[in-house]
Amino acid sequence: MSLRTCDLAVIGGGPAGINAATIAARGGLSVVVLDEHPRPGGRLLGQLHELPGHGEDGWWRGAEIARAMLAEARSAGVEIISGASVWGLRPEWEVLVEGAPFETVKANRVLIATGAVEKSVPVPGWTIPGCITAGAAQVFVNVHRVRPGRKAIMVGVNVLTMTIARELALAGVEVVGIAMPPLGPFSAEAANPTRVIAGLTQMAGLAPSPLLRLAGAIFSERTAGLGAQLFPKGGVKLWSIPLLLRQAVVEVLGDEQVTGVVIEEITADGQPTGHRRQVELDLVCISDGLYPLSELAVAAGCRMADVPELGGRVPLYGPNMETTAKGVFVAGNITGIEGAQVAAAQGKVAGYGILAGAGRLAPNDPAQTAAREELARVRAGSPIRFHPRLSDGLQKLGQAWQPLAGEST
């Protein structure tokens, strides 16, 4: 069995993992980053959106940011292995990997920065070629520079679909709308306009449409039902793309390729009305958001908690991003669904936490304090919030950690 030894093994080459690896390497630790994708960088590689105040022109270009991060990591001496899938994690700590020049990494400490996975809602006909996840469409356009279709509809109303709809439009794809999924056993609140509006009102300040911002100021979570009833059946436009809260895609049409969809008008609570129409198109993008990819944390023996406000099941962690499993740290979307800026800031906190745990950093070091302050600042000012009750989720997580503090070093 081929073996590689190091001070720190980082699982996941996104912004959280890379930032942590860079700081740990600069602090004198030997670091190996394992990433399953052909190119490291995580979801940064597919991100392109406006971000007021960022850079010279107010655009967030994830690929450029990823290149800069990776260059810093390599200059710090971080070894980055792409195309390497981690399939197991044994105590003390042996990382089992496939696709690398070695089969096992023996590390004193492990950072799990595996990110998140996209959820989909089943729609009749969703296995027809031309029906893909919204995240896949984003990769086609922003990573490979390929338009996955000419005329598209988004299924699912959430931050992810709204963001990617605009990215598709910027790439020259005609996006006919962002519609609801059909009501069913797997769609739950995602198919209920009232519940969707309740979530959107919590994020109305970020809305690109003045009408949506006004709606957020008028309606609250308690009056979301009224907002859903009054929502125009023809939709409200976001960047010239109709947001169709009172229309659901109930079927994807086609044989060897998507040729269109069936759209049905729905009530304020998602019930079908029987009023249907067909729309010709060649691309359907489905998404019900993201959930934390936390299986390796479970395998490591980390204590977990179900926190819907953070997107699902997440590991409990402390102020240094340490978990209850000795020597195991976490950062990024495995801790809850947030934006890339927050993940990058968490990576810095984890990096300094790892150095502190290794005895390479004095207690309350100014750099560590600055990293925590940066995380709080970035989180408070984040332009993208995937879950409206994020603060409640973070509070729950902090309360759950308190009695466990000290279990991990």
PLM ranges: what are they?
Residues 2-409:
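Residues forming the flavin
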